[in-house]
Amino acid sequence: MMIRGIRGATTVERDTEEEILQKTKQLLEKIIEENHTKPEDVVQMLLSATPDLHAVFPAKAVRELSGWQYVPVTCMQEMDVTGGLKKCIRVMMTVQTDVPQDQIRHVYLEKVVVLRPDLSLTKNTEL
C-alpha cells in the first residue's frame, strides 16, 4: 500500500455553524464515495478555513460521520492571500491505498471549481 493525499474544497455563502457543517459533510461524503475510502484507511485529515469563517471548526463535521470518530483530524486557518477565494473550506485526507496517484478522485465543489479546472470532478458541482 502507498500513502496518498486526497484533496477537496468547497465554499459557503454564510459564516454559520449549520452551513459550514453541512457543506463540509457534503464534501467529505463525496470524497469518501468517489474514492471508496474507509475510516481505517485514513492516516489523518487536515482541514483549513479562510480567515472569514469563525462560526465552527469544520472538523466537527467529521465527527458526524458514522465510524470516523477515531480518525485524527485538525483544523487550521488558510493563508489570507489578496484576491484569494473567500469563505472556503479545504480538506487534505491522507490515506493508505493501492490506487495509483493519477486515479485519486479529488473533489472541488461550489465556487472552488475555479481552483482546479484540470481535475475531472471539478466539472461536477451537483451531488
UniProtKB/Swiss-Prot annotation:
Cellular-component GO terms for this entry: cytoplasm
Q: Which cysteines are joined by disulfide bonds?
A: none
- BP term (GO), one: aromatic amino acid family biosynthetic process
MF terms per GO, please?
A: chorismate mutase activity
The subcellular localization recorded is:
Cytoplasm
Q: Which domain of life is it from?
A: Bacteria
Give the Chorismate mutase aroH-type domain ranges.
3-121
TM stretches of this protein: none
Task: Give its E.C. classification number.
Answer: 5.4.99.5
Its recorded reaction(s) are:
chorismate = prephenate
Main location group: cytoplasm
- What does the function comment of this entry state? Catalyzes the Claisen rearrangement of chorismate to prephenate. Probably involved in the aromatic amino acid biosynthesis.
Other remarks on record?
A: This enzyme is monofunctional, and its activity is unaffected by the end-product aromatic amino acids.
Q: What is this protein called?
A: Chorismate mutase AroH
Native species of this protein? Bacillus subtilis (strain 168)
Name of the gene encoding the protein in the UniProt record: aroH
